[in-house]
């Protein structure tokens, strides 16, 4: 607040009849009163368990281009796909139910389809309802998209969407006309869990995070051939030894999600664990696909090349490979270029009531013995993120790696600290080069922690996931119902 915006000095009649010194004194008294009133209101609301809005937008070297509210749905995963001359964003949602602004009808949260051809004017064109239920028990969190022109046995004129249906199953939809999505097939159903799957568009191989009823874990991998999406073919079920039916002893950490380098790279990087007891597993893709499919301990162990084990305090949510990195420092050394994987943990507890979750940079040049070489963390100060409300810590990275960013810049979703842009050109020394924290809105939901007298709730941004498109635009979606923001990184 300043004198020109207060409304006092800008009124000509008052200014001409009252001495300026008196006006200035009145302005300062009013400003002090408003500050005290706001603090008192916040205190009273906090004592009553009422949510209080926390902040406006904040940024450095990142600019907001466009915004889509997503009907106030809690959002998990964005994927952006070029379809002819159009660019379409597909956003998976957590469970819940709200009105579809296109139809006026209440729908269970599922998949939002947004035309982002003009990133400054994103436009919701369709919503596919998901499984009924709230939070993790409903919705359709995960989305992947492939063009039929890329899939070996698909209709070349089609575009296909692979998505979860709550925790129950996986589906394929025809989204050739984004405004009129049509279901193609249920790939698998009657599951007890799903999550962040991966789909190779050039081969059609899909690594589906599933929970088969007879397995000992909520999340493992089902490998499917979706080269013809209308006719799915199961290749094998896969997980860590000890997770399979009939095994005994402690159950290894459940799967979170895989990222494959395809046939050319011949590696799949699996992330197990969320915020504790994490494992990054390196798997030989060819052996995974062609090896014996019976889920015995020996058969499950056979494709593994190596693994990186995190502490009991950190998990492995996202495992982003950054391979073939040329570093001037090591140009003449044996082992150049070098391969890395960015292992991103997920924060789960509000207001820092858990070990800090962050990014681990793992050197996998020697795949049998991966070694951590660096970490990236967002400092709690000066943003006071532990007291803002909601989660503070890492969650995920972008997964698309277009030429302008590949091996150079990675983006990390950091819940109430927004999205962070990080220079990874020297993986031994990751360096933040920008950030964007959206403003809360009237749709932003509260986040609560238990107290001795009940609970304390605060409204806070919860940047949940981030993705980039091949044009270089950055997309972030919010877990606390704030919508999708489209950003541009400064050069």
Residue ranges and their predicted role:
Residues 2-10:
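Extreme N-terminal basic, low-complexity initiation segments
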Residues 30, 52-491:
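Feature marking well-ordered beta-strand scaffolds used for ligand recognition
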Residues 37-48:
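Bacterial N-terminal signal peptides
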């Amino acid at each position: 607040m300043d004198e020109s915006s207060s409304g006092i000095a800008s009124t000509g009649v008052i200014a001409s009849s009252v001495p300026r010194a008196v006006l200035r004194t009145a302005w300062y008294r009013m400003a002090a009163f408003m500050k005290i009133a706001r603090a008192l209101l916040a205190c009273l609301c906090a004592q009553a368990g009422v949510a209080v809005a926390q902040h406006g937008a904040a940024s450095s070297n990142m600019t907001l281009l466009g915004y889509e509210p997503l009907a106030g749905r809690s959002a998990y995963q964005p994927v952006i796909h070029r379809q002819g001359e159009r660019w379409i964003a597909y956003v998976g949602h957590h469970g819940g139910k709200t009105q579809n602004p296109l139809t006026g009808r209440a729908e269970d949260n599922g998949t939002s389809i947004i035309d982002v051809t003009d990133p400054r004017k994103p436009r919701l064109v369709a919503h596919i309802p998901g499984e009924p239920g709230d939070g993790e028990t409903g919705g359709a969190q995960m989305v992947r998209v492939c063009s039929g022109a890329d899939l070996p046995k698909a209709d070349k004129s089609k575009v296909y969407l692979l998505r979860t249906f709550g925790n129950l199953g996986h589906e394929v939809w025809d989204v050739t006309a984004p405004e009129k999505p049509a279901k193609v097939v249920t790939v698998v159903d009657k599951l007890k869990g799903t999550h962040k799957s991966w789909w190779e568009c050039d081969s059609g191989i899909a690594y589906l995070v599933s929970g088969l009823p007879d397995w000992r874990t909520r999340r493992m991998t089902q490998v499917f051939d979706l080269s013809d999406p209308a006719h799915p073919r199961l290749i094998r079920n896969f997980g860590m030894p000890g997770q399979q039916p009939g095994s005994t002893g402690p159950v290894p950490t459940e799967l979170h999600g895989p990222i494959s380098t395809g046939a050319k790279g011949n590696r799949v990087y699996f992330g197990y664990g969320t915020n504790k007891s994490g494992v990054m597993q390196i798997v030989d893709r060819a052996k995974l696909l062609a090896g014996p499919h019976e889920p015995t301990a020996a058969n499950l162990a056979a494709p593994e090349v190596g693994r990186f084990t995190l502490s009991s305090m950190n998990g492995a949510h996202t495992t982003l490979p950054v391979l073939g990195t040329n570093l001037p420092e090591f140009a003449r050394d044996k082992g150049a270029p070098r391969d890395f994987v960015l292992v991103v943990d997920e924060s789960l507890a509000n207001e820092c009531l858990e070990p800090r979750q962050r990014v681990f940079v793992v050197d996998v040049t020697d795949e049998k013995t991966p070694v951590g070489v660096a970490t990236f963390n967002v400092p709690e100060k000066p943003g006071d993120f532990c007291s803002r409300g909601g989660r503070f810590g890492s969650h995920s990275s972008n997964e698309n790696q277009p030429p302008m960013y590949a091996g150079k810049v990675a983006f990390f979703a950091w819940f109430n600290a927004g999205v962070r842009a990080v220079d990874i050109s020297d993986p031994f020394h990751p360096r933040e080069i920008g950030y964007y924290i959206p403003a809360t809105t009237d749709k932003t939901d509260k986040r609560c922690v238990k107290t001795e007298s009940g609970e304390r709730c605060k409204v806070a941004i919860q940047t949940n996931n981030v993705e980039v498109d091949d044009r270089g635009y950055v997309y972030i979606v919010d877990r606390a119902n704030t919508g999708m923001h489209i950003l541009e990184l400064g050069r």
